Each structure stands twice: as structure tokens, then as C-alpha cells.
């Protein structure tokens, strides 16, 4: 029975309801069943239905690299796990991506890979299907680059912000690439008034990029804010204690920017102290400070300075994970309101249970609109193959 015959016996709305509960990778395959199915699965109604259901079951996305190949897994985030102190979850394999690139960041369901050096192109990848699109190269003649993959929720546009660094890691030139236009071209923009070194810690919140930076003169830490829509920079002061610990992470907590870091007990194990600063007033730059103690009550899990802060979930749980894949591999969920720590053993990584570095992202949601954007980039964009070097461009 072909797709057209099947649709006569089963209402289309019911078909869409059933399909909306499948993984995005399966939806991609079903586009090929027939023209009718391809048309149904492209409807805005179905895309929104799929996103609604996917948003109700956010997942923790993992990325591992081994021998030049990236593999993506995800596991369900605990839903109302109170009363438990530990349990086991199984990671689902999504896809592999054979490119020898450095992972850069994750935005709105897409993973952005940065080649880091001027001889290679950057890549945007769909972690559910492995489909990807390459970005046009910026013809720079020197140095290393630092990139940020950003999203403007008002203009519904993805942008890439690229900073060129000179020998002392000082930011020299800044360019931006707007995706979603017919012709994709790099533009040079005004630099931040603070001459600074860019760290690897950042977050994009409601169309604003925040990243930790260090003043080139006194090496004091700041938070630089970049408005994705207006493409303007400003700097925020912050208590220097935020930068003194082993692990520092920017988070989005109750609609506000936050900074968290860890302080280990003697010997590197539990209990851990988690310090959090929250920006209560942006204009006045007023921060509040909280300190929490994380305890592993069962004393089953052993950690020795090998945890990193993945982020904070939409339900307000700080997520910690081990820096290397090992067996057993644990993820920890600390609930700030209840002051409880949940230990989750993640199984199912297979051959990757051998000390690969871990990249993890909270609240991963599959979005068909975003995934279609990658395919649109590959098929219809006209890339500017002769992007202008800094010496030729004007502000």
C-alpha cells in the first residue's frame, strides 16, 4: 500500500499526530515515502506540533570525537525525579559526522564547528541527521579565530560572529556573517571599546551574546555583551571571585544572566561547593550571590577534580558531568530550590567508553524548522567566494 492509499483510510491529522512523536531522523526519511507525505511533513502546522511535543521532553546532547569522527548521542533529562538519589539512563545514538574539526558551540538545536585556522571552513551541523552546510571562508592573512554561532529571535536570523586574534590572543578584527539572506557575505563591524582577550566561556540569551573576557592591560575579568540584532558591544563589571575557581560557567537562570563555579573539597571529591552570581539589574550592574553545598549521599560516585558544569535546565537544575567518557559515566543534576543532588549513570556509548573528551548541552530539542534551514543553506545560498580581507574592508 503506497502513501496515497494509506492517507485515504487514515485521517491526515491522525497521521501527523503519530509522526510528531518520532525522532527527527525518522521524519527526514518519511519525506521520501511519496509526494503527499513530503508535502504533509513540510506543513507549518506539523513543524509546530513536532516542536511542541519535542519541547516537552528535552534531552541532554553529547558529542564525542575519535579519530577525526564526531558522534552524537542524547539521553532524556529527568522529569520530576524527586525522592530518588540515583538511577540509570540509556543514551540513544543519533548520527556520526566525519570531519576533523573543533566543536565550537550549540545554538537552537544546531552544532557549530569551527576549523579555527584560516585554511579551513566552518560548518553548521544537524546533530540528529548528520546533515551539514559549510560557511564561506573569510580570507584572513594571519592568526587564529574565535567564533560564536548566534540567533536573533526577533529577526529570526542566525549569525556567526568571528574574532581574529593576534599573537597575544588580543582581539584584532571582528566580522559577522548573517545567514538567511540570498547572498551570504562577511562584514567587518565596530570592535568592542574594551581591548580584551576572549575566553571560551559564553552564552546567548534572548538575542544577546555574553562572554567572559580579560582586560589586556590588567587582566581583570569582565563580561562582554554583544547585541545580536544591533551588533553593538558593551561591558559589564563582575566580582573577580567568579574567575578564581577551577570551573566557571555562564547560565540563564530565571530570565537573568548568571555565573556559577565549583570549589572541590580536599582530595577533589564530594562535597562540592557551588557559587552562583545572578545579574539582578543590568543597568545598575547589581549582582546577588548564593553558595550551595552538593553532597553525594550514597557515596557511590567518586570524582577527582574531573567535573565540568554543563549548564542549567529550564526547570532550574544545574547539570554537572565528567570531563572524560569512562565506565561508569555519570551526570549529576543539582536542584537549586530543593537542594538535592541526583546521580544519573549514562549507558550506551559503546566504543566511546574510553576516555574521549565530553561535550554536552542541556535542553536539546529537535526543531524541524531549524533543521530545514540547514538544507536550505546547502541548496539555495550563493556564497561569496571572494570575501574581503581586513585590509580591504571599511567600517
From Swiss-Prot:
UniProt name for this protein: Putative F-box protein At5g42430
InterPro entries membership: F-box-assoc_dom_typ3, F-box-assoc_interact_dom, F-box-like_dom_sf, F-box_dom
Stored Pfam families: F-box, FBA_3
Domain F-box: 4-53
Species of provenance: Arabidopsis thaliana
Lineage of producing organism: Eukaryota, Viridiplantae, Streptophyta, Embryophyta, Tracheophyta
SUPFAM superfamilies assigned: F-box domain
Amino acid at each position: 500500500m503506497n502513501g496515497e492509499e494509506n492517507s485515504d483510510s487514515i485521517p491526515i491529522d491522525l497521521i501527523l499526530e503519530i509522526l510528531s512523536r518520532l525522532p527527527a531522523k525518522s521524519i527526514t526519511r518519511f519525506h521520501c515515502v511519496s509526494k503527499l507525505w513530503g508535502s504533509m511533513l513540510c506543513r507549518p502546522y506539523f513543524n509546530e506540533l513536532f516542536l511542541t511535543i519535542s519541547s516537552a521532553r528535552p534531552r541532554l546532547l553529547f558529542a564525542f570525537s575519535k579519530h577525526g569522527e564526531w558522534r552524537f548521542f542524547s539521553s532524556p533529562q529527568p522529569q520530576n525525579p524527586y525522592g530518588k538519589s540515583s538511577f540509570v539512563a540509556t543514551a540513544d545514538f543519533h548520527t556520526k559526522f566525519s570531519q576533523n574539526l573543533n566543536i565550537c558551540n550549540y545554538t537552537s538545536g544546531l552544532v557549530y564547528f569551527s576549523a579555527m585556522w584560516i585554511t579551513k571552513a566552518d560548518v553548521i551541523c544537524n546533530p540528529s541527521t548528520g546533515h551539514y552546510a559549510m560557511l564561506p571562508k573569510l580570507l584572513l592573512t594571519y592568526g587564529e579565530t574565535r567564533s560564536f554561532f548566534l540567533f536573533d529571535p526577533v529577526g529570526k536570523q542566525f549569525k556567526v560572529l568571528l574574532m581574529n586574534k593576534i599573537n597575544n590572543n588580543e582581539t584584532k578584527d571582528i566580522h559577522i556573517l548573517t545567514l538567511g539572506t540570498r547572498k551570504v557575505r562577511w562584514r567587518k563591524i565596530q570592535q568592542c571599546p574594551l581591548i580584551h582577550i576572549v575566553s571560551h566561556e559564553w552564552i546567548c540569551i534572548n538575542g544577546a551574546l555574553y562572554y567572559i573576557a580579560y582586560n589586556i592591560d590588567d587582566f581583570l575579568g569582565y563580561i562582554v555583551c554583544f547585541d545580536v540584532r544591533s551588533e553593538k558591544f558593551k561591558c559589564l563589571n563582575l566580582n573577580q571571585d567568579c574567575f578564581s575557581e577551577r570551573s566557571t560557567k555562564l547560565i540563564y537562570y530565571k530570565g537573568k544572566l548568571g555565573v556559577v563555579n565549583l570549589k572541590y573539597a580536599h582530595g577533589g571529591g564530594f562535597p562540592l561547593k557551588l557559587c552562583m552570581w545572578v545579574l539582578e539589574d543590568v543597568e545598575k550592574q547589581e549582582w546577588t550571590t548564593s553558595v550551595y553545598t552538593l553532597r553525594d549521599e550514597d557515596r557511590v560516585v567518586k570524582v577527582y577534580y574531573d567535573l565540568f558544569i554543563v549548564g542549567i535546565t529550564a526547570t532550574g537544575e544545574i547539570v554537572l558531568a565528567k570531563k572524560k567518557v569512562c565506565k561508569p559515566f555519570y551526570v549529576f543534576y543539582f536542584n537549586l530550590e530543593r537542594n538535592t543532588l541526583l546521580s544519573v549513570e549514562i549507558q550506551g556509548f559503546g566504543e566511546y567508553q574510553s576516555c574521549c573528551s565530553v561535550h554536552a548541552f542541556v535542553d536539546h530539542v529537535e526543531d524541524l524548522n531549524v533543521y530545514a534551514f540547514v538544507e536550505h543553506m546547502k541548496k539555495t545560498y550563493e556564497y561569496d567566494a571572494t570575501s574581503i580581507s581586513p585590509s580591504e574592508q571599511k567600517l
